[in-house]
Regions:
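Hydrophobic face of amphipathic alpha-helices that form TPR/SEL1-like repeat modules
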Residues: 28-35, 64-71, 100-107, 134-143
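Short helix-capping/linker turns of helical repeat alpha-solenoids
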Residues: 1, 19-23, 35-37, 42, ...
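Low-complexity/repetitive intrinsically disordered segments
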Residues: 1-5, 9-12, 16, 159-166
């Protein structure tokens, strides 16, 4: 758009808005700290701001907070908390969180392994064009995980993934 990005100025304004309770700014500021855009990278501070925004309903922060707990970035790795935040984000309609909930069920991370539930969540993510869900559904149908084994259906999911470049 012809405008040069000034992350340091952005951080200044995000901080003012975030500290006054603006959940959108809290999420943006958290991302700045998470990636080190305009500030020194500080994943713990990112978790702090993701938590503030998530607690008032920001579904992007809910999903990102799930990532922080899943991967142990800025917080101790805790699959149960990751699953909890992914689930909240997914229930709020976050498309990637639906895929993440599916992965938790598929792998048994933070929740009992349940391939049928994984398939349900992968299907919801696939309906929103999450490419990874196409692949995972292909795997589920190919191996009979949570569904009857069906190589034709598996191949159709793998083809959808390939068409998306996955």
């Amino acid at each position: 758009n012809g405008v040069q990005k000034d992350f340091e100025a952005s951080v200044k304004w995000y901080t003012l808005a975030a500290d006054s309770g603006n959940e959108w700014a809290q999420n943006k500021l958290a991302n700045c700290y998470y990636y080190g855009d305009g500030v020194e990278q500080d994943e713990q501070k990112a978790v702090e701001y993701f938590t503030k925004a998530a607690n008032v309903g920001n579904k992007n922060s809910m999903n990102r907070l799930g990532d922080c707990f899943y991967y142990g970035r800025g917080a101790n790795q805790d699959y149960a908390l990751a699953f909890e935040w992914y689930s909240k984000a997914a229930e709020a309609g976050h498309h990637i969180a639906k895929f993440n909930v599916g992965n938790c069920y598929y792998n048994g991370y933070g929740v009992d392994q349940d391939f049928a539930k994984a398939v349900e969540w992968y299907q919801q993510a696939a309906e929103q064009n999450i490419e990874g869900a196409f692949n995972k559904l292909g795997d589920c149908y190919s191996n009979g995980y949570g569904v009857d084994q069906d190589f034709e259906t598996a191949m159709s999911w793998y083809l959808k993934a390939a068409e998306k470049g996955n």
